[in-house]
């Protein structure tokens, strides 16, 4: 049988129903755009990062010791099997005149190489290659003068350098948040490369390690992470006793030098004592000679008298010289004694050094890598949830659309069947319609997702990072998944509906589809209500339940759009609500000052005097330490800050309060942990938690959104650790908490000999802002997608409703109903169903929002669970506005319809 008429009819179905075709196409476009765009962003970022890591041969782990790495440490690390190990020097200084902190590195041989963006690497002692983000402040050939902290031993041969190039570090990805420093204000501002010959010490500060079995792995994969953790544990075990051994070596070396100094001092004292005795004897001899000369001088000839005087004069000069030499010796002896005492003090102040094994996220300057990893993980989590809901809504609407399409083509289907066409041929027409609409929309959405949406999201994340913009790749598997979902959402409904509707014989198909039979609804049984309803309201009530499929599709279509809109806006609200609560209400201090444990009483007094100055509003001495632990619910090792006070709380520096009720918590009851830590450790109040090789009972869980904290008083610490502790840090509140003032006070404190480090909240704020920025942009895009989805859904369902009931509308119009009444006759149903959908959508959106913020939050961040009033009002207002605009469109459309033509019989 020739199919010319068949194909002509198929083509006509495309051209005569452009709105329907475009609506299905748009739904599939939006679904595939969100799915592909969100799902390929993370792999694009990971592939770009992996290429950068491979090119720069970035380290896997770094080992740093409090006192550097001596020969024994180096030999032990070089013995690690299956690893390449390189040692490097680094030093924190300040830029003269600005007080900004800069970290000098010695050039690495091959691991974690620096990328030259302009100029060249330093070759001589007086040359320096500066961080590329300072290229707008300095030029090649400029001189940079650096300063070391006052009162410290000089670690550089020179302080003045000529800039010969600009570089980017493969370890410090962020160009804004470089972490903490031991100079300046406590925050690192820049870094540079200098020749290793510039350093006075040859003792390396760090070891860079790259493992053979990790080199070819995706650095963001679970396989890489598990192997890395295993290597990290091996290194930690290897270095476990190095601190004690190093302490013993240093102590023995110091004891040897002190003993040697004591011997030299004893010899010097003996020599000086002998010299003093000799001087005394010479003085007596001289006094005797002078006395004899005075007695005999009158009797001596002039010549002999002159000779005797000359002899006495020479003896006196010799004695004076001996006295001078003795005085010089006494001064030098006093210096030697002071040096010996200083050496003894340093020996007594020696502490067991700690060896730290860092990964790329936790190493100094690794904040950029951490931000990059967190942001990509959050985007991936959104991509696992958001498109699923979107496709589900799209599938429901497509089902309704195809049902209406089959009803419209019922007569044509009967004609084709009467002409001898098989049922499957007729069904194929609808399947092809859904296939082409879905496939074209999916392919367009896939291309936009691959090369537009993913680029926008990733470029926002990588702004200010040395890694540069993410490259865009095409993923065949994601395209196939999108096409598969399109098949399910657009082709299967077409097949299922057409198969169900076209089972009848040709003669029945040529007749109009029998109207849906009415039935008595529940509200009719409530006579006291039913009798008060007008005719049109009764019709509306009956029709709502008469067309159950359309009713459900409208409700759930609107509900799905509102839920997606609520979730997107809710995440923006949750992200925006964190910063103020965390850094103004919960952590209200500006600085943490870490004191040197070996500070002298004079140095400690200087620090106390500085803390008492008027620019510091209040301060609190505490004991603090950092603990690293692997938790059940965490992807990586978590960094936890422990704070111990001698009071019952940390007020007014830290607000300890419950997350839900906001009730104040007291340290009298025991240990209090932060909410995200409790979530990852999967503990509640009353449970026991093991950290830092010690187990304690959780007495309270405090509200906290960024970072992990453990709070306790002295009594709890002593009970857990079996020892008392003394304050080693200070929490500071400033009278003027402006950024400039925080920097000024930080620099003043860092200049004090008793201060080891100053920590600002800036690092935590930067960590949070990096995630917040990427999520905010992503949510903005998804909010736009949700709005477009709502427009398509309501427009589509409204058109279907009007088209299905045009004869009914024509009837009531010719009966004398006014235009407004005709419009409301049908549109009142849409309004009621949409309102129900909005209410359901708000409820569903709330739970979707709660689920999303739990899924997408990085390990160190908890998003604020509550949302602002605008999150409720915007979806409601937006949908109501859309209903009004569509109502105007429907009214305009119904005014132009030829009612008499619509009433003509199709029999």
Predicted regions and their residues:
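Interfacial "coupling" helices/loops that link adjacent transmembrane helices in transporter permeases
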Residues: 9, 15-17, 396-435, 776, ...
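Short, strongly hydrophobic transmembrane alpha-helices
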Residues: 16-44, 60-62, 435, 443, ...
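Small-residue-rich transmembrane alpha-helices
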Residues: 399-404, 409-411, 435-467, 476-503, ...
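Juxtamembrane segments of multi-pass membrane proteins
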Residues: 535-668, 675-676
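C-terminal transmembrane helical bundles of large multi-pass transporters
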Residues: 728-733, 746-854, 858-889, 902-906
